[in-house]
C-alpha cells in the first residue's frame, strides 16, 4: 500500500526503493499468489516528487546525476512488476498521474473506482512523460497514448477502460472487494502455470508472429510435461477440483 498521502503518494526515492524491494521479496514467497498495489488517501499516485526534483537542482551538476538515477530507479521498478513471477493488480482509488499512471499501466491488471482519473501531464510542465510513455504505449492504442501524452489532459475511469488502461471500474465502496475477488480467483489457479503464462505473455508480444508461435509452442510443450498440467487435465476428465 502506498502510504504517503500527505505527499500525494508521490514516487520519492524512498518510495521507489521500498516498492521495488517489496515486489522482489514477494516474487520469491510461495505463500504469496497475487500482489495488489493500493494506496491511502484520495490520490493513488501523483508521480515523481517534484519537491525532491526541485531541490536536486541545487547540486553542483544541477541535478544531472540525481535525475538519471531517479528515472533509472523508476524504470527498474516498472520492469520488476512486469518481470515479477506473480500477477500484480493495481487497486486505483483516486488520481494517478505521470509516473503514477505509468505504475497503473505497468501492472498486469488494474481496477479503479468510478471517480478515479488518469493523466500524463508532464508536457504541461515542460517535462515530457518519456518513461511513462513506455508502459502507456504498450497497453493502449498509439493514438490514445499520444493524445494523453501530447495534451496532458485528465481522463476519467470510463475513458481509461475504453482505451484499456484499466480493466474495469466500480464504486469506491466496492473497489477493494472487487479487487480481492479477482485476486482470489487467480490465486486458485496453479502458481506454476500462472508464472509460466505471465512470463510467456510478455516475451511473445515483443516477437514477430512466426517467432512468437515458435516460442509459445515450446512453452506449451514444456508446460504440458509438468505435474500441474497432468493434474489439471486429469481433474477435468474426472470432473473434480484439481489439487495443485
Task: List where the protein language model places each region.
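Terminal peptide-recognition signature
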Residues: 4, 18-19, 37, 49, ...
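Helix-loop "lid/cap" segments that line or gate small-molecule binding pockets
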Residues: 148-149, 200, 218-224
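Glycine- (often His-adjacent) and acidic-residue-rich active-site loop
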Residues: 24, 39-80, 96, 208
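Charged catalytic carboxylate motif
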Residues: 14-18, 73, 80, 178, ...
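Conserved CoA-thioester-binding segment of acyl-CoA-metabolizing enzymes
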Residues: 1-40, 76-79
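Crotonase-fold acyl-CoA enzyme core
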Residues: 79-192, 225-226, 231-234, 240
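Hydrophobic alpha-helical segments typical of transmembrane helices
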Residues: 66, 73, 77, 132-135, ...
Amino acid at each position: 500500500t502506498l502510504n504517503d498521502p500527505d505527499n500525494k503518494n508521490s514516487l520519492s526515492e524512498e518510495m521507489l526503493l521500498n516498492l521495488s524491494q517489496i515486489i522482489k521479496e514477494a516474487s520469491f514467497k510461495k505463500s504469496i499468489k497475487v500482489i495488489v498495489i493500493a494506496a491511502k488517501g484520495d490520490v493513488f499516485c501523483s508521480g515523481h516528487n517534484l519537491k525532491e526534483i526541485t531541490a536536486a537542482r541545487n547540486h553542483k551538476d544541477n541535478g544531472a546525476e540525481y535525475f538519471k538515477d531517479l528515472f533509472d530507479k523508476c524504470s527498474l521498478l516498472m520492469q520488476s512488476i512486469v518481470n515479477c513471477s506473480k500477477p500484480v493488480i493495481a487497486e486505483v482509488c483516486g488520481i494517478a498521474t505521470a509516473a503514477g499512471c505509468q505504475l497503473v499501466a505497468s501492472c498486469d491488471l488494474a481496477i479503479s473506482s468510478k471517480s478515479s482519473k488518469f493523466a500524463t501531464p508532464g508536457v504541461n510542465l515542460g517535462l515530457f512523460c518519456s518513461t511513462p510513455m513506455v508502459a502507456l504505449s504498450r497497453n493502449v492504442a498509439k493514438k490514445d497514448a499520444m493524445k494523453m501524452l501530447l495534451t496532458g489532459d485528465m481522463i476519467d475511469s470510463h475513458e481509461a477502460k475504453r482505451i484499456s488502461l484499466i480493466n474495469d471500474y466500480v464504486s469506491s465502496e466496492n473497489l477493494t472487494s472487487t479487487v480481492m475477488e479477482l485476486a482470489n480467483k487467480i490465486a486458485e489457479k496453479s502458481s506454476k502455470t500462472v508464472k509460466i503464462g505471465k512470463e510467456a505473455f510478455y516475451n511473445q508480444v515483443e516477437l514477430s508472429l512466426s517467432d512468437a508461435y515458435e516460442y509459445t509452442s515450446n512453452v506449451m510443450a514444456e508446460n504440458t510435461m509438468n505435474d500441474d498440467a497432468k493434474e489439471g487435465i486429469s481433474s477435468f476428465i474426472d470432473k473434480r477440483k484439481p489439487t495443485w
